């Protein structure tokens, strides 16, 4: 990816990330998500990016949680959802990821009272379950 000792080749990097991600490597899934999100070494594919970030997020990769929130906020591969963006940013904040608090403060100002109540309810449900069970119950993907 960075060309350490070899020429930079995003296509080759994508191939290696893909192989490693398919073996369950969390950081490779995060890198794969970025590749799909940005179109680096592969055509942009928001749904595949979300799938890769989801894998990493469910295994407590904090930046993946932040990016999933961003995707819901911007409608990248999903319908824009302030409640889901708030939820994922809150889950990222729980892992002390920079930017999550600012995003939460920003989106709170844009949310209706009903949206905010639903988002808080979803967050509390996730705190009472494993994140995997929470995502299944709330159909978050």
PLM features: what roles do these ranges have?
Residues 98-141:
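Terminal, low-structured helical/coil segments at or just beyond the last alpha-helical repeat
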Residues 2-4, 9, 22-26, 38-40, ...:
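Short helix-capping/linker turns of helical repeat alpha-solenoids
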Residues 15, 30, 66, 86-87, ...:
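TPR/TPR-like alpha-solenoid signature
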Residues 1-2, 29-38, 42, 52, ...:
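Hydrophobic face of amphipathic alpha-helices that form TPR/SEL1-like repeat modules
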Residues 19-20, 55-56, 92:
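Canonical positions in the second alpha-helix
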Residues 86-97:
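Short, flexible beta-strand-to-coil junctions
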